[in-house]
Each structure stands twice: as structure tokens, then as C-alpha cells.
Amino acid sequence: MWTKPAYTDLRIGFEVTMYFANR
């Protein structure tokens, strides 16, 4: 199973990536 901290960090990283990609 995924650990919550790792999952959250991955999600945040994905959010940031999408944010910069949309710029």
C-alpha cells in the first residue's frame, strides 16, 4: 500500500508539474 506522506508528496509534485505545464 502507498504511504500517505509519499502519496501526498507525489500528488503535490504532480499538481506543481501540471501548473507549470499549463503556463
UniProtKB/Swiss-Prot annotation:
The keyword Lipid metabolism does not apply. The keyword Cell cycle does not apply. Transmembrane segments: none annotated. One of its GO terms (biological process) is pyrroloquinoline quinone biosynthetic process. Keywords: PQQ biosynthesis. Required for coenzyme pyrroloquinoline quinone (PQQ) biosynthesis. PQQ is probably formed by cross-linking a specific glutamate to a specific tyrosine residue and excising these residues from the peptide. Belongs to the PqqA family. This is Coenzyme PQQ synthesis protein A. It comes from Pseudomonas putida (strain ATCC 47054 / DSM 6125 / CFBP 8728 / NCIMB 11950 / KT2440). The gene is pqqA.
